[in-house]
Design a protein with these regions (language model features):
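Amphipathic alpha-helical coiled-coil/heptad-repeat segments
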Residues: 131, 151-229, 385-391, 403-440
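Short, well-ordered beta-strand elements within core beta-sheets of diverse protein domains
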Residues: 7-11, 108-112, 150-156, 253-256, ...
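Specificity-determining recognition surfaces
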Residues: 125-154, 283, 378-410
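Non-catalytic DNA-recognition/assembly elements of restriction-modification systems
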Residues: 2-31, 163, 182, 186, ...
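A short beta-sheet element
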Residues: 47-48, 64-126, 138, 145, ...
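Structural signal for hydrophobic
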Residues: 16, 92, 151-152, 162, ...
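Phosphate/adenylate-binding "loop-and-lid" substructures adjacent to NTP/NAD/dNTP-binding pockets
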Residues: 1-4, 215-255
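Sequence-specific dsDNA recognition surfaces
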Residues: 6, 22-35, 49-78, 247-252, ...
């Protein structure tokens, strides 16, 4: 890049000058490992894969032979600036360790001459990278050669000003890190608060009870009657296990609930609990358009679907081979492979949809007798999630069985109270989300 290009892009103070980077640093590259130069003593070295912006990853270092002359040329010392030739072109870090080490040929070593603040030029390279002056839009090379690096035009302030600039940048960086740390702490606090709200909700302690509400036991009998009719019609099979549970397996999960609540298995209120299907041919079956095909990554949590990265299958597959997993409005979806237990509710506007085998589908007997949002929030409560995770199968990809889902213990309040609980949860969650958004 020519000097005039930089002069047109940047204005510098009168007591600064422009200069080639190579005039400010002693510049070397490392050693290439090949059969022609295999003599010398085996020593550890680093490559571009060890160098990140302002940091190093030094696990599993490799060794190769270095002769005495190669050691002198390829060794880095504390304070040297390393710059990547390829990969993320121009990525740089300062070696701030007391021990010395060797470098491979795709790394540039810049050792500053007197009156040069190395950290200042690290930040210059970082600024050039962010603005496109290195790679793509600027130097425009597939690799940053020694000649290209040498010829990069950089500003040269007085040495004391270089030091002051570095101090100011690092002070700002520290402030930013502190802000990010506090944001992370706040995010954790918000998630913990949400978890506590859900815990209170499923224990009947979030909203007051109304003695005039129809008890959940009566509600359950109405659901059972509808389910029995579906069984008689041959549309569904009878549950394998009794549906009412008054205590958890450890005799403590489900105690002290309000008198008009009841404990049930999820299967007691479900018409079907199944999972999606892998299309024939796997990913080859995906289309550019057609029927939306959900994967675990589309299940965003609570009641939300993320349709931003949706795959598609053709309508014939949807109606035939994949007919078991045709989704309906208000189906509750649960991830059962990979990241376990995320939930979503299928909205009418997103249909038609299908899903793959990493997603469980829970379809209620009657959506008018159970508030699907209450059920989704219940499945996200710490008690339920920990119970499900405890039952997961520890494989290369953790997974939950449909039996795990069906046997999930649900604290069921009266229908009217379900609605009040959902309203309270969403009001509190909206406030917490507003707080989180204000610090973004």
């Amino acid at each position: 890049m020519k000097l005039c290009d930089f002069e047109s892009d940047y204005e510098i103070p009168n007591n600064w000058v422009w200069c080639n980077l190579g005039l400010l640093f002693n510049h070397n590259t490392g050693k290439a490992l090949n059969s022609a130069n295999s003599e010398g003593k085996a020593l550890t070295y680093i490559t571009t894969s060890n160098v990140y912006w302002n940091r190093f990853e030094l696990n599993d270092l490799k060794s190769m032979p270095f002769t005495d002359s190669e050691i002198e040329k390829c060794t880095i010392k504390k304070g040297d600036l390393l710059v990547c030739e390829g990969g993320d072109i121009g990525r740089a870090a300062i070696w701030n360790f007391d021990n010395e080490i060797r470098i491979q040929n795709h790394l540039h070593r810049l050792r500053a001459y007197d009156y040069i603040q190395t950290a200042f030029y690290y930040y210059v390279l970082y600024a050039f990278k962010l603005s496109g002056k290195i790679s793509g839009n600027g130097i425009g090379l597939q690799g940053l050669s020694s000649n290209a690096l040498h010829n990069i035009i950089v500003p040269v302030p007085p040495i004391e000003e270089q030091k002051n600039i570095v101090m100011s940048i690092e002070k700002l960086m520290l402030s930013i890190d502190n802000i990010e740390s506090h944001k992370n702490i706040l995010a954790i606090c918000i998630e913990n608060t949400k978890a506590k709200i859900l815990e209170l909700a499923i224990r009947g302690k979030l909203v007051p009870q109304d003695p005039n509400d129809e008890p959940a036991s009566v509600l359950l009998e109405r659901i059972r009657a509808e389910k029995e009719e579906l069984i008689k019609q041959g549309k569904i099979k009878r549950d394998k296990k009794e549906s009412v549970i008054f205590k958890g397996d450890d005799n403590s999960y489900y105690q002290d609930l309000p008198s008009n609540w009841i404990n049930i298995r999820l299967s007691a209120i479900s018409e079907i609990i199944t999972k999606g299907t892998t299309p024939r041919g796997g990913k080859i079956a995906y289309r550019q358009s057609g029927i939306g095909f959900l994967r675990a990554e589309n299940i965003a949590g609570y009641d939300k679907l993320d349709l931003s990265n949706l795959n598609y299958v053709d309508e014939e597959s949807h109606k035939n081979y994949l007919k078991r997993s045709i989704l309906k409005e208000n189906d509750i979806l649960i991830t059962i492979a990979g990241t376990l237990g995320r939930t979503a509710i299928v909205p009418q506007h997103a249909l038609p949809l299908n899903s793959n085998q990493a997603v469980a589908i829970v379809r209620l007997v009657n959506n008018k007798l159970i508030n699907v949002k209450y059920l989704a929030y219940t499945l996200n409560s710490p008690i339920i999630k920990s119970d499900l995770l405890a039952k997961s199968v520890d494989m290369a990809i953790p997974n939950l069985s449909l039996d795990n889902i069906a046997e999930c213990n649900i604290s069921l309040p009266p229908l009217a109270e379900q609605k009040r609980i959902v309203e309270a949860i969403e009001k509190i969650f909206a406030t917490l989300d507003d707080i989180a958004n204000q610090v973004e």
